[in-house]
Amino acid sequence: MAQLVEPVSNLAETKPRVSPGIGICLSGGGYRAMLFHLGAFLRLFELGLLQKASRISSVSGGSITSAKLGLEWSRLKTRDDFFAHVVEPIRRVAGTTIDKPAIVEGLLLPGKVADYVAAAYRKLLFDGATLQDLPEKPEFVINATNVETGTLWRMSRQKMADYKVGEIDKPTLPLASAVAASSAFPPVLSPFVRRVEPSQFSRRYADTDALLKDISLADGGVYDNLGLETVWKA
């Protein structure tokens, strides 16, 4: 009878520990997801549960709502505040077609379609806000897919990162660009190209500088449409 060389470890002891707290994941799905998550956020706010969240992870259409919530977080004291600063702006977006005009502009004018999508988000929701305008707590994580590595590219106040490429601390990426990257549905709305240089990375995991320049990003749902990974992975 075969014998184990070493005792079998308890699975619970070897799995990465998840920090205690409430994590909220927002899936993709275009405007439908944007509005669904808006209603969910409102109800959680009314119940006093949203304020207890530790991390909020979003993908694609969910990132539109999540980023606006994060930007307005410090102003949300009452239900009326929530309607004024989050619900009404998102409703206005729902009544605006963004993708079709951006596609036409991308075909007829210089620049990529995703750049025109970002410009629309900037005008409608975010103005000049960047990832640094998100609150420290809860942590908002906006997810896209790195087309070059096929893995997750996360964007937050703390960092932008891909475990195959590296990490950039305290990024100043515009919120509109982060949301445009997260919702860059292929093939028409993607890629969103983020201009970066190897020197911007505080930690490097890639073997070649080619992966550290001009990161090509697509809809976060290509990798993980539920936005689960960045809730249980720090």
For each of these PLM feature ranges, what is it?
Residues 2-22:
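N-terminal regions that are enriched for targeting/export leaders
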Residues 19-25, 30-115, 120, 156-157:
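Patatin-like phospholipase
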Residues 32, 96-99, 104-107, 134-233:
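Active-site gating loop/helix substructures
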Residues 40-43, 47, 182, 231-234:
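Generic, well-ordered alpha-helical scaffold segments in large soluble proteins
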Residues 43-44, 127-129, 202-204:
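A generic local structural motif
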Residues 45-48, 132, 208:
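Structural motif
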Residues 115-138:
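Extended, Lys/Arg-enriched charged tracts that mediate electrostatic binding to polyanionic substrates
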